[in-house]
């Protein structure tokens, strides 16, 4: 059986996202594009995961809670979780304390919107989310595993924010089983 998926989707919460990237728009576009499985992987946060999970459930799409964590070395790593609760706990206990308290400049990066399942704004994250955490690239896999999550280096072959562009190598000794 073939499955069509996208495990690297950002919402209106990510600074690189657009205000149109609401839970319903994400899921409805996924349906229109024939996707069976999606993961929301905003930068260093899971605050819109619960809303997208609910919309995906109603639409019959398999949803995987996720996050795109930026390491201390400025490498992006997708973390995919078994549940919304595990993702939110990982953010609260591991990522949030490791993210510098630098304010988001809304004039440049836009509003980082937290939305409900009806696309209503219920808050905003005032920290600049697309920033390096103090978590090292070789510790992400171990930390994610504590929450039964899988860590996968993101866009590994891109010229920025990837294992190859920053370190020039990818090795299983770094704790990743998937590249």
Identify the meaning behind each predicted range.
Residues 1-73, 167-173:
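An N-terminally biased module of ancient metal coordination in phosphate/nucleic-acid-related enzymes
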